[in-house]
């Protein structure tokens, strides 16, 4: 079993990776597959592809943003294997923290089945040692869609993830907004998140 970078993957591996990605996310949450190839797309291969992750370094921070993470099957351990391989690989190349956003199960108007899915997703990440960050009103630009998200993070040094608070938390919020979503610290959206999270 190994992680294969998109640049090194055979066409049939990329075709299967595309299928896993498109099956794993609804259309409103998907970027084009070609867009993913601008970042670091990796595929976990065990005879055939079983999971896909897309990552983007958060310039100059030592952190990496996990854009997408999806296993071909759920409930069979593929997600845990993918997580272990990705976090190990990111640590080996020098990243000290992985940050990502997840859909908020408390978002208004969400169907009960979707609430359950979102809670399970967060539960999976918590079991892997990640932390939900105490950030409120994190609203990354997603085209026409305005969707509040939650931020999570995991330290990649091998030990438990320490609480992320104060100036460290502010730096995470600003880095994600700037290097993932293109919003600088003075943007009203960023300022609002920092203010309501007690980080201004």
Q: Which stretches of residues belong to each language-model region?
A:
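C-terminal "cap" of GNAT-fold acetyltransferases
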Residues: 117, 131, 138-188, 195
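A eukaryotic "domain-to-IDR transition" signal
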Residues: 76, 101-103, 131-136
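Conserved GNAT acetyl-CoA-binding A-motif
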Residues: 90-113
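Conserved active-site tyrosine of GNAT-family acetyltransferases
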Residues: 125
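A conserved beta-strand-loop-helix scaffold within acyl/acetyltransferase catalytic domains
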Residues: 14, 22-73
């Amino acid at each position: 079993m190994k992680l294969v970078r998109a640049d090194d993957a055979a066409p049939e591996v990329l075709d299967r990776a595309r299928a896993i990605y498109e099956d794993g996310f609804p259309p409103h949450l998907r970027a084009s597959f070609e867009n993913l190839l601008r970042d670091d797309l990796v595929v976990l291969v065990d005879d055939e592809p079983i999971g896909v992750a897309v990552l983007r370094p958060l310039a100059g921070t030592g952190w990496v943003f996990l854009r997408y993470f999806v296993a071909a099957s759920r409930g069979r351990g593929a997600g845990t294997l993918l997580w272990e391989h990705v976090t190990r690989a990111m640590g080996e190349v020098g990243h000290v923290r992985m940050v990502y956003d997840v859909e908020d199960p408390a978002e208004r108007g969400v169907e009960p089945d979707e609430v359950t899915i979102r809670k399970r997703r967060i539960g999976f990440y918590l079991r892997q040692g990640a932390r939900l960050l105490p950030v409120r009103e994190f609203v990354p630009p997603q085209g026409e869609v305005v969707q509040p998200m939650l931020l999570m993070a995991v330290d990649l040094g091998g030990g438990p993830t320490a609480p992320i608070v104060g100036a460290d938390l502010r730096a995470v919020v600003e880095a994600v907004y700037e290097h993932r979503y293109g919003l600088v610290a003075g943007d009203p959206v960023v300022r609002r998140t920092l203010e309501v999270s007690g980080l201004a």
